[in-house]
């Protein structure tokens, strides 16, 4: 019974604290274009308050965005490619 009560308290908190990865979009629905990783890291961390960012397929891909930040809908294969690339950079 205690485990069930703890689960009910902790489970909603886990969903609130989650972060996501993706191409962050501005208020007009556009993604920042890039050629260099430094530009994207600054764009993602200072404008979108993500953990870090880099240039993936000529667009700024942000890692660790807050759940309320809008991201561009992309194919799963593109997302997987960009996620793997950022893991390799760490």
Swiss-Prot record:
| Disulfide bond entries | 34-55, 40-60, 44-62, 56-82
Question: Which InterPro entries does this UniProt record tie to the protein?
Answer: LCN-type_CS_alpha_beta_dom, Scorpion_toxin-like, Scorpion_toxin-like_sf, Scorpion_toxinL/defensin
Q: Does the keyword Phosphoprotein apply?
A: no
MF-aspect GO terms: sodium channel inhibitor activity; toxin activity
Primary localization class, coarse: secreted
Record-level GO BP terms: defense response
Which SMART domains would you find in this protein's record? Knot1
The LCN-type CS-alpha/beta domain covers: 20-83
Specify the signal sequence span. Answer: 1-18
This protein's source sits in the domain of life called Eukaryota
Location(s), subcellular: Secreted
Keywords of this entry? Disulfide bond, Ion channel impairing toxin, Neurotoxin, Secreted, Signal, Toxin, Voltage-gated sodium channel impairing toxin
Query: In which family does this protein belong, per the annotation?
Result: Belongs to the long (4 C-C) scorpion toxin superfamily. Sodium channel inhibitor family. Beta subfamily.
UniProt domain comment: Has the structural arrangement of an alpha-helix connected to antiparallel beta-sheets by disulfide bonds (CS-alpha/beta).
UniProt-recorded name of the protein = Beta-insect excitatory toxin BmK IT-AP
